[in-house]
C-alpha cells in the first residue's frame, strides 16, 4: 500500500474545508497513511473582476489542478462536483463521489425575507446564471446583480453593499458555519440546484490503480447514481457550469425521480421536464434517464435558448 498521498486543492476556505474533510476520512480508514495538501490557484481564482460566464465555460476551477496531477505532482484532487466538467481530460477519472450534502440553495437576506416576501424591486446578488434565471422566472420584478468571490468575501461585500439578499448553496454555507444567516432554504419546486451540487468529486490518474483502490471506501453509491444522471443530462445538452441549467435527481422509496430546468438568463423563457422510473440500479440506467430528459428539453426548445446564451457570452 502507498505510504503517502498528496491532495491537490484550491486555496479558498471552502475548498480547504473539503480537502481536509477527505483527508480526515481517508485517515480514519488508513491511519498510517501520510496525507498532505497542495494548494493550487485556478483561473477562476485569479480573475475576480468579471462574471464567470464571461471568462470561460468549462474547467475554470479545475483545469490547473488537473494539469498538476497529469505531471504526477499530486495523487488526487478534491473538487466540488458541480465545478467538474462532464468531459474529463485524457488520463484522468472521477474515482469517487462522496455522499451528497443537502443540495438546495438558500436565501440570505438582511430583513430575513423569503423569496416570496422580498420587497418589489429588491436587489439580489448571485454569481450564478442558473440562480439568476430561476429567480427572475419566479420574481421578474427583482433586480439581480453579479457577486463573485469566496464565501467569506461574499458575506463581507453583502453586508457592505446595497443588495437586500443573496443566493448561495446550502452545502457551502453549512460547511463554513454561516448557517445562522440563512433566511430560507429554497424548495426544489422554486429553484433547482446545479448539476452535482452538494457532492465532492475525487479525481485521480486513470492508471494510478493503487490510489483508486484506496478511494473506493469514499464512494457513495446512491449519490453516484443521482449525480451521474445529472451529469449525463448536462453532457447531452452540451452545457457548462455557466449555463442556466438546474437539475435534481433523487431516489425515494425505491423510485428514481429526476427534474431539470433550462431557462433564458432573464427568466422569461423556461423549460421544465421531469421523469420518474422504478428499479434504477446501475449507472448506465441513471445516465439513460439523463439523456431522455435532455432530449425532452431539446424537443421543447432548450437548444435555442442555450445557443443564444453561448453566442451572447462569446
UniProtKB/Swiss-Prot annotation:
Family: Belongs to the HMBS family.
EC class of the enzyme, as a word: transferase
The protein, known as: Porphobilinogen deaminase
Pathway: Porphyrin-containing compound metabolism; protoporphyrin-IX biosynthesis; coproporphyrinogen-III from 5-aminolevulinate: step 2/4; Porphyrin-containing compound metabolism; chlorophyll biosynthesis
Function: Tetrapolymerization of the monopyrrole PBG into the hydroxymethylbilane pre-uroporphyrinogen in several discrete steps.
Source species, domain of life: Bacteria
EC id: 2.5.1.61
Catalytic activity line of the entry: 4 porphobilinogen + H2O = hydroxymethylbilane + 4 NH4(+)
SS bonds (residue pairs): none
Cofactor note: Binds 1 dipyrromethane group covalently.
Classification via Pfam families: Porphobil_deam (PF01379), Porphobil_deamC (PF03900)
Record SUPFAM superfamilies: Periplasmic binding protein-like II (SSF53850), Porphobilinogen deaminase (hydroxymethylbilane synthase), C-terminal domain (SSF54782)
Assigned GO CC terms: cytoplasm
GO molecular function: hydroxymethylbilane synthase activity
Oligomer status and interactors: Monomer.
PROSITE patterns linked: PORPHOBILINOGEN_DEAM
GO biological process terms on file: chlorophyll biosynthetic process; protoporphyrinogen IX biosynthetic process
Requisite cofactors: dipyrromethane
Keywords: Chlorophyll biosynthesis, Porphyrin biosynthesis, Transferase
Note from the entry: The porphobilinogen subunits are added to the dipyrromethane group.
PTM-bearing positions, type S-(dipyrrolylmethanemethyl)cysteine: 241
Organism for this UniProt entry: Chloroherpeton thalassium (strain ATCC 35110 / GB-78)
Gene this chain is encoded by: hemC
Amino acid at each position: 500500500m502507498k505510504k503517502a498521498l498528496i491532495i491537490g486543492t484550491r486555496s479558498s476556505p471552502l475548498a480547504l474545508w473539503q480537502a481536509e474533510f477527505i483527508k480526515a476520512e481517508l485517515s480514519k480508514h488508513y491511519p498510517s497513511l501520510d496525507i498532505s495538501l497542495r494548494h493550487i490557484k485556478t483561473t477562476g481564482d485569479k480573475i475576480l473582476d468579471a462574471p464567470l460566464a464571461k471568462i470561460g465555460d468549462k474547467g475554470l476551477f479545475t483545469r490547473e489542478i488537473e494539469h498538476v496531477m497529469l505531471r504526477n505532482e499530486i495523487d488526487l484532487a478534491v473538487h466540488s462536483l458541480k465545478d467538474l466538467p462532464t468531459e474529463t481530460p485524457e488520463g484522468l477519472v472521477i474515482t469517487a463521489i462522496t455522499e451528497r450534502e443537502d443540495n438546495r440553495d438558500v436565501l440570505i437576506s438582511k430583513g430575513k425575507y423569503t423569496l416570496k416576501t422580498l420587497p418589489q424591486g429588491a436587489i439580489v446578488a448571485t454569481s450564478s446564471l442558473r440562480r439568476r434565471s430561476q429567480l427572475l422566472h419566479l420574481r421578474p420584478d427583482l433586480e439581480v446583480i453579479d457577486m463573485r468571490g469566496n464565501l467569506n468575501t461574499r458575506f463581507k461585500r453583502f453586508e457592505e453593499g446595497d443588495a437586500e439578499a443573496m443566493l448561495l448553496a446550502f452545502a457551502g454555507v453549512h460547511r463554513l458555519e454561516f448557517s445562522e444567516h440563512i433566511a430560507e432554504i429554497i424548495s426544489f419546486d422554486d429553484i433547482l440546484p446545479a448539476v452535482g451540487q452538494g457532492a465532492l468529486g475525487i479525481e485521480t490518474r486513470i492508471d494510478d490503480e493503487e490510489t483508486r483502490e484506496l478511494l473506493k471506501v469514499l464512494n457513495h453509491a446512491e449519490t453516484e447514481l443521482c449525480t451521474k444522471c445529472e451529469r449525463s443530462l448536462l453532457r447531452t445538452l452540451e452545457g457548462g457550469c455557466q449555463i442556466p441549467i438546474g437539475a435534481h435527481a433523487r431516489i425515494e422509496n425505491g423510485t428514481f425521480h429526476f427534474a431539470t430546468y433550462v431557462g433564458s438568463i432573464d427568466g422569461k423563457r423556461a423549460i421544465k421536464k421531469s421523469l420518474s422510473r422504478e428499479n434504477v440500479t446501475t449507472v448506465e440506467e441513471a445516465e439513460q434517464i439523463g439523456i431522455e430528459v435532455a432530449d425532452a428539453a431539446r424537443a421543447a426548445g432548450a437548444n435555442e435558448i442555450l445557443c443564444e446564451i453561448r453566442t451572447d457570452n462569446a
